[in-house]
């Protein structure tokens, strides 16, 4: 999983 802000 990836979370980009």
Curated annotation (Swiss-Prot):
State which Enzyme Commission number(s) the record gives.
2.4.1.5
What is this enzyme's catalytic activity, as reactions?
[(1->6)-alpha-D-glucosyl](n) + sucrose = [(1->6)-alpha-D-glucosyl](n+1) + D-fructose
Keywords for the protein's UniProt record, in alphabetical order: Glycosyltransferase, Transferase
Superkingdom of origin organism: Bacteria
GO molecular-function terms, A-Z: dextransucrase activity
Q: Has UniProt tagged this entry with the keyword Zinc?
A: no
Q: Does the keyword Glycosyltransferase apply?
A: yes
- State the protein's purpose: Involved in the production of dextran, an extracellular glucan polymer.
* Protein family per UniProt: Belongs to the glycosyl hydrolase 70 family.
What does the record's miscellaneous section state? The dextran produced by Leuconostoc mesenteroides CMG713 has a molecular mass of about 2000 kDa and contains exclusively alpha-(1->6) glycosidic linkages in the main chain.
Would you tell me the protein name for this molecule?
Dextransucrase 2
What broad taxonomic lineage does this protein's source fall under? Bacteria, Bacillati, Bacillota, Bacilli, Lactobacillales
This protein's encoding gene:
dsrF
């Amino acid at each position: 999983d990836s979370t980009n802000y």
